[in-house]
UniProtKB/Swiss-Prot annotation:
GO terms for molecular function: RNA binding; structural constituent of ribosome. It comes from the Eukaryota. GO terms for biological process: mitochondrial translation. SMART domains: Ribosomal_L2 (SM01383), Ribosomal_L2_C (SM01382). This is Large ribosomal subunit protein uL2m. It comes from Bos taurus. It is found in: Mitochondrion. Keywords: Mitochondrion, Ribonucleoprotein, Ribosomal protein, Transit peptide. Belongs to the universal ribosomal protein uL2 family. It holds the Pfam family Ribosomal_L2. InterPro entries: NA-bd_OB-fold (IPR012340), Rib_uL2_dom2 (IPR014722), Ribosomal_uL2 (IPR002171), Ribosomal_uL2_C (IPR022669), Ribosomal_uL2_RNA-bd_dom (IPR022666), Translation_prot_SH3-like_sf (IPR008991).
């Protein structure tokens, strides 16, 4: 131990001789000349580490985010991870960071999107392949119809070679619901299992998109449809909103075993704080009433009716 201390002390000593100040032809006093020479030639021990000046340098203007793309493509698009931070660099979502590099595949959540040159009305598409998507929990399917291809969320039993129907027609009688088809809620029979539900007509699916989830069409009231979400909460939308029949694919997603902490880092999940936290009022079982029904239907007010 003593030998190690002596070795470190000898290593810290500088073996280079100190630079002597040579007085030259100057009108300044000798002491000030010596100080100027020492300031011009600092020793290596006086150089302290400094922070870079360009800490807020702007990103490259050539990089185009996948969110700003206006032309649809089925090819994987390069994606830059945010690490849970916004454009100012502040953390907005904790627990995000790292992970394997991923490429984004643009999903078309608007199932009834006829081509410009096609006839108006229902149209069919054929499933080409069903594959894994690293950016979401559910599997995705590549479908083709007419002169285009697009990615959609796959249902539970969807496989290559299947034919799916996309319709916007609401008839007097309910249609025969077939898994993978997309119909307005007003055309489906009550009790149908649905997924990828729109909140507004033509906006695209926003609800029930995670792996293995499904909702239930409870009832139809005055041109609206009441849906039960996977959280048991009810939602009211117009009957012209489109939904897909069936259950979302990858049903066993919640049964997977991570196995080790490193796999969570592969998936881009950062560890939480190891500090002990006291459990608050959220912990434990309790009798809690269901939240009120969420409605996307703009009902006329009482003042407008009068």
């Amino acid at each position: 131990m003593a030998l190690r201390v002596v070795t470190r002390a000898l290593g810290s000593l500088s073996l280079t001789p100190r630079i002597a100040a040579v007085p030259g032809p100057s009108l300044l006093p000798a002491a000030q000349v010596t100080n100027n020479v020492l300031l011009q030639l600092p020793s290596a021990s006086m150089l302290l580490p400094s922070r870079p000046l360009l800490t807020s340098v702007a990103l490259s203007a050539k990089f185009v985010s996948w969110k700003s793309r206006t032309k649809y493509t089925t090819m994987p698009v390069k994606m830059r991870k945010s690490g849970g931070r916004n454009h100012t660099g502040r953390i907005q979502v904790h627990g995000i960071g790292g992970g394997h590099k991923q490429r984004y595949r643009m999903i078309d959540f608007l199932r009834f999107r006829p081509e410009q040159e096609s006839k108006p009305g229902p149209f069919e598409e054929k499933v080409i392949v069903v594959r894994y998507d690293p950016c979401r929990s559910a599997d995705i399917a590549l479908v083709a119809g007419g002169n285009r291809k697009r990615w959609i969320i796959a249902t539970e039993n969807m496989k290559a070679g299947d034919t799916i129907l996309n319709s916007d027609h609401i008839g007097r009688m309910a249609v025969a619901a077939r898994e993978g088809d997309a119909h307005p809620l007003g055309a489906l029979p009550v009790g149908t299992l649905i997924n990828n539900v729109e909140s507004e007509p033509g906006r695209g699916a926003q609800y029930i998109r995670a792996a293995g989830t499904c909702g239930v069409l409870l009832r139809k009231v005055n041109g609206t449809a009441i849906i039960q979400l996977p959280s048991k909460r009810q939602m009211q939308v117009l009957e012209t909103c489109t939904a897909t029949v069936g259950r979302v694919s990858n049903v066993d997603h919640n049964k997977r075993v991570i196995g080790k902490a490193g796999r969570n880092r592969w998936l881009g999940k950062r560890p939480n704080s190891g500090r002990w936290h006291r459990k608050g009022g959220w912990a434990g079982r309790k009798i809690r009433p269901l939240p009120p029904m969420k409605s996307y239907v703009k009902l006329p007010s009482a003042a407008a009716q009068n």
